[in-house]
């Protein structure tokens, strides 16, 4: 069983009212293939950029309950995140680490519908979430070497992508850039909006065992992120998404994911994560709920999968 240890007082147990980008539209009915969960401890994940290090037969991914439903349109390179778009049945995706500041809108099979340019550079975009008012929050906080000092969340509306508000932040417990290799847990590829805050989930490059959770306000400004909790996650988290009813958090990692259930945000952050293997899927980077029980997953190689939870 995977434990969770809080390093600050837990947040009050309020009911979730979030629509983290995870809250996706109902574009297809859930398919009927069963889900198979892993029965053993997950393997350690590889470092980003080693695309071939986890290449497996697609049949193995299908055995784990994944259904390959499509391929991202050519030209959409190294999809790094996924988020429901305002238009039903469509999703936003984007590249990372110095690519053009382009956001693509695709359908549930990965085919491009349209695209727009965001009015801010792509230092290392890694995640995208939204609030109930239609604001989107792009996490420009990829930090492979734990040495960046220009971390930001980019707030925008798709109808006016040239107008970007910057939520600049720093971590309260980082004093060296970079820190010692054993302390490099300041890379962040997963974030989501909830109740006026943008929550950040780190990717532990040091021990691949601890996901630190921070929060910053959802308004533009300069902030020191608030340390919220530490989650024992034996993998490197690549995306985060919240179910439409707000009672289930999914943390995606490399060829695996972790599910945390609860009746409140505080309960979710104290829940024991349930591990699901995605072995054979490739470098899984983006996740968004298609409906309450179906997850859409994209890989850096461009594959699009569905998974019943």
Where are the language model's segments positioned?
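Sec-dependent N-terminal signal peptides
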Residues: 2-26
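Sequence/structural signature of beta-propeller domains
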Residues: 22-24, 28-309
């Amino acid at each position: 069983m995977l434990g969770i240890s809080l390093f600050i007082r837990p947040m009050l147990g309020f009911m979730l009212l979030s629509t983290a980008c995870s809250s996706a539209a109902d574009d297809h009915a859930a398919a009927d293939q069963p889900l198979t969960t892993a029965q053993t401890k997950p393997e350690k994940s590889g470092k980003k950029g080693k695309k071939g290090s986890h290449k497996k037969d697609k049949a193995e991914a299908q055995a784990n309950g994944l259904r390959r439903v499509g391929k991202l349109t050519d030209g959409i390179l190294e999809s790094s995140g996924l988020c429901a778009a305002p238009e039903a049945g469509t999703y936003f995706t984007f590249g990372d680490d110095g690519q053009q500041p382009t956001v693509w809108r695709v359908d549930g099979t990965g085919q491009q519908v349209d695209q727009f340019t965001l009015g801010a550079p792509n230092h290392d975009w890694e995640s995208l979430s939204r609030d109930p008012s239609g604001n989107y929050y792009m996490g420009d906080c990829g930090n492979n070497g734990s040495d960046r000092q220009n971390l930001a969340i980019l707030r925008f509306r798709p109808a006016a992508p040239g107008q970007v508000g910057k939520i600049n932040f720093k971590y309260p417990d980082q004093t060296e850039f970079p820190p010692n290799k054993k302390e490099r847990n300041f890379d962040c590829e997963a974030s989501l909006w909830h109740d006026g805050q943008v929550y950040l989930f780190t990717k532990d490059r040091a021990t691949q065992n601890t996901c630190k959770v921070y929060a910053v306000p959802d308004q533009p400004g300069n902030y020191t992120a608030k340390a919220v909790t530490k989650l024992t996650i034996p993998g490197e988290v690549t995306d985060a998404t919240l179910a439409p009813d707000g009672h289930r958090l999914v943390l995606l990692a490399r060829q695996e994911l972790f599910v945390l259930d609860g009746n409140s945000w505080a309960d979710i952050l104290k829940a024991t994560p349930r591990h699901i293997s995605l072995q054979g899927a490739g470098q899984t980077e983006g996740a968004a709920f298609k409906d309450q029980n179906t997850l859409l997953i994209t890989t850096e190689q461009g594959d699009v999968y569905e998974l019943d939870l």
